[in-house]
Amino acid sequence: MKEKGFWEGAQAAMPTALGYVSIGLACGIIGAPYVTPIEMGLMSLFVYAGSAQFAMLALIAVQAPVAAIAMTVFLINLRLFLLSLHASTYFRHTSLWQNIGMSSLLTDETYGVLMGELAHTDKVNPMWMHGNNLNSYVAWFVGTVVGTALGGLLPNPEIFGLDFALVGMFIGIFASQFQIMQRRIPVRNLLKILAVVTVSFFLLLTVVSQSLAVLFATLLGCTMGVLLDGQ
């Protein structure tokens, strides 16, 4: 059987790419009052993180200090370090630069596409992974830049509810992930983790900002998950 290459990887990423274009348009339209299309393009090229870019735009809107923006992006994207570590185990014999290239463009969705491919095969060609990553990368870049250009033509983009686009996407992801987790993790443990996140969030709101409360509550929830797992 012929080994799958770059174009097969790009084809496998088409559902992700289409989703990135739509979410990218929403991100660009929302960010239009605060950044130019060129600035948004540079943000997408060098940051390339949907949730982090939405957070950046929210912080830019309130004129938050650069240090706060950088720390927020770092914490939001920290999970990608773990995803890259795991993905690299399937490319042990690939060169360092190839692995750096794959890890630099890895996202939650392209990682999911990789895991889906590995469910049907034991080995993935690095070029397949580059196709998977690059198709999604270009789609996000195009979506955000076009969205920013269009946003400048809309007097009040909030009326379209586009600011809820990423939230809606994550609700869908969480719902599907919750169903999968139920098969491996007892429901009572999931409820304990949710309780820790909820209670700690409202307690933290009394001493820190909302954005920091979300981040710290998430870290506490992760800690609770590790303790309950016992590993």
Features from the language model and the residues they span:
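Alpha-helical transmembrane segments and their helix-entry boundary regions
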Residues: 40-43, 54, 69-70, 97-101, ...
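Helix-loop-helix junctions within the multi-pass membrane cores of secondary transporters/permeases
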Residues: 71-163
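Helix-loop-helix hairpins and the membrane-proximal interhelical loops
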Residues: 1-49, 56-73
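Hydrophobic, membrane-facing alpha-helical anchors
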Residues: 18-24, 51, 107-121, 159-176
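Intrinsically disordered, low-complexity non-transmembrane regions of multi-pass membrane transporters
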Residues: 1-9, 123, 184-185, 230-231
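Juxtamembrane membrane-interface segments at transmembrane alpha-helix termini
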Residues: 52-60, 81-88, 173-180, 206-207, ...
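Membrane-embedded alpha-helical modules
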Residues: 126-216, 223, 227
